Amino acid sequence: MALSSNWQALLASESNPTSNGKNKQSNRKIRNVKKVSKTVNVSSTTQYAPRKRKNGSKIMDMVYNMNKEISKHEKDKLEGKVFEFNPNKANTSTTIKEPVKVGISEDTRINSNKSKEIGKYIAMDCEFVGVGPEGKESALARISIVNYFGHVVLDEFVKPREKVVEWRTWVSGIKPEHMKNAITFKEAQKKTADILEGRILVGHALKHDLEALMLSHPKSLLRDTSRHLPFRKLYAKGKTPSLKKLTREVLKISIQEGEHSSVEDARATMLLYKKEKTEFEKIHRNTFN
């Protein structure tokens, strides 16, 4: 009986066990090599993988960073790069020196290094107290004049000729103690007249201040911010704008937040004039030429 080819091959393999064993061993080696290489690859990958942080290490990092920032802050403080408020050195006094200045002060005015000469342009402002029945009438109590650059030319408290009924301190800033070194009305009038002579006078509602001083000044030499038409149209619907409103709207500066200062108000009017000087002079030429 003839054997099939498959059967013959099976017999041949059984008759040669050595060869078959070698093949099996060889196959095992190949499989082992594959396993080893796989293991090596896995180990090489896990060797560089980041380890999980423990909670303790996060806290230590935070402590380290905090200490680092503290050290940097101390170093900057020693080098003067850091401002530190020291309550022991701070001036916490509630006493306010007179006169109260808000907004435009000696230190904040523009052109503070310019000439202190009187010059061609001056700005004037006055403060008043109440006299007469119920203190409803006004009497001159302070006169202040500054030059074009804001330097004080004249600043004097003035003794009213009438008995003061209402000091109006809340708005005027004038107090009874200011009268100790005050000059007389006649002295104030004379000093002011000498300064005004031949100069361009800037102010707000100048008619009122000049009448209080019993002085006159040529209209061609007046620059009144309360009567400047562009200001009236833009900020008061054609009426007379307050100095406080003009200063806030035009200069972006707040004044008269408490007791008034005639020095501050005079500086404010000069700044307003300088801001719109071209328009002021254009209207002036059209009016007087």
UniProtKB/Swiss-Prot annotation:
Source species: Saccharomyces cerevisiae (strain ATCC 204508 / S288c)
Stored Pfam families: RNase_T
InterPro entries linked: Exonuclease_RNaseT/DNA_pol3 (IPR013520), REX4_DEDDh_dom (IPR037431), REXO1/3/4-like (IPR047021), RNaseH-like_sf (IPR012337), RNaseH_sf (IPR036397)
Sequence ranges of Basic residues compositional bias: 25-34
Record's GO cellular component terms: nucleolus; nucleus
One term of GO molecular function: exonuclease activity
Keyword set includes Aminoacyl-tRNA synthetase: no
Protein name (record): RNA exonuclease 4
UniProt region (Disordered), positions on chain: 1-34
Lineage per the UniProt record: Eukaryota, Fungi, Dikarya, Ascomycota, Saccharomycotina
